Amino acid sequence: MTEKELLAARQSIVQKLTQARLEKGLSQEQLAKRIGTQRSNICRIEKGTQNLSLDLMLKIAEALDKDVSVMLEERSSTMEKVYSLRLYDETLLTFTLEERGLEGLQATILHAETAKQKLFPLDLELTNEGVVKWLERRVIPKNRQFVDEILKTLGLSVNNTKGIMDVCMGLSLNDSYWVVPADFDGKYADYNFYENRFSEALSLVAYTGVGGSREAFSTSPELTTNGMLRKAWRFVEGDGIYLYKGGTEGAANTGNEPYSEYYACQIADKMGIGCVQYDLENWKGILASKCRLFTDIDTSFVPIGRILRKTTLKACLDYYKTLGDEFYEQLCSMLVFDALIYNEDRHFGNFGLLRNNHTGEIIAPAPIFDNGLSLFNYAMPDDFKNLSAYAKTRSNPYRISYEDVCKEVMGAKQKAQLRRMVDFKFTRHPSLNLPEERLTAIEKQLGERTRELLSIPVQRSTKRKNEPEG
């Protein structure tokens, strides 16, 4: 349905209601009193300058003794497929969305507020196909652990992007966008996950894979959270929102990811690199890393892979240079940090930037997070007999050796950060730790690795005038 056809259908409903009012001999003022609203609202609706919401349509139809089912059927045929992408309560994009058999999910853009384009999602391409791709990226991924169990509680399947959107309204803890029917009157303040409690029951399903009937659930950030491992968002009363994340399962060398998160953030802290803080907790009998949400209602996280058309390490470095020294140095420091801890999973979805939701400006590098596949998390006991040899078998996702990456990005600042790691020792958790012999072996290897990386010559200048090293 085109925007013109949609407008014509709306006008048809309004005309029928206006005719019914006149036939009843009611003035706009009298009708307004009957339904508990202002005459100005009735006037604007009949002039076509105000959308007729579902709630108001039902009240007017009842007051005029019109068949509500006929009104609903007519409205449904025109409005059920029309959605709006909003930032807070500001509509950025209006589009239709419908399943078309073998063609699959199809969108048609009706109107885009191009004057506000600086506020649009950075990874949204303003084409019909681009809208569908953006929606598909926004919902829970098919490879997420317990995805079927999560969606089954809501009567949904993993391929039902529109159905998932209808339930969760596209709400997320990454940003402040949401996707709702075009005539939806609700306010963002009443629905967002930052300020409103979300389904604890669905969080348990997301984390344990076990849950009850769909009646127990409401919308949840689980429906728009990426990643493979078991995880769940929890609202901790008086403290904030936390992500609980488990480890891999099914083999003798799995399950160590939460430990790696806990210990890796200690290394980042020692180096003086901005990092999300992790703790460890047994929740529901399952070991989890626990970290506080680092976005808020005013600030969003944008993965670098959602910004760059070409996702290569060189493209990332070039882009960060355009953002300024702070951004570029943080990226270089992260890459050296990853080389130090042998992080094998620094893909283009788990690092990026923070954005001001109100202005659309990129304001800072995001803190480092998601270090679970590091510190030899998959190493078997035999591997620790010669950890240096095992370390040489580890690699990053870029198909470039850690050492070659460091040769490109090593600067005076990174050298100063590495020097802080000399004689580093982990702080043990009060109750949840890797075996002591494993920890001491990792500490020894970190010492060797620190010396190796410090031997790499500085290829670029990072020191400004009157700025001390380290």
Task: Report each predicted region and the residues it spans.
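A short, Lys/Arg-rich alpha-helix, primarily the initiator
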Residues: M1-E23
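Canonical protein kinase catalytic loop motif
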Residues: H347-F348, G352
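Recognition helix of helix-turn-helix/homeodomain-like DNA-binding domains
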Residues: K33-N51
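DNA major-groove recognition helix of helix-turn-helix/homeodomain DNA-binding modules
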Residues: D55-V70
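Short basic helix-loop element that most often maps to the first helix and adjoining turn
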Residues: Q15-R34, K59
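Phosphate/dinucleotide-binding and metal-coordinating scaffold of catalytic cores
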Residues: R75-V336, L340-Y342, L354-G470
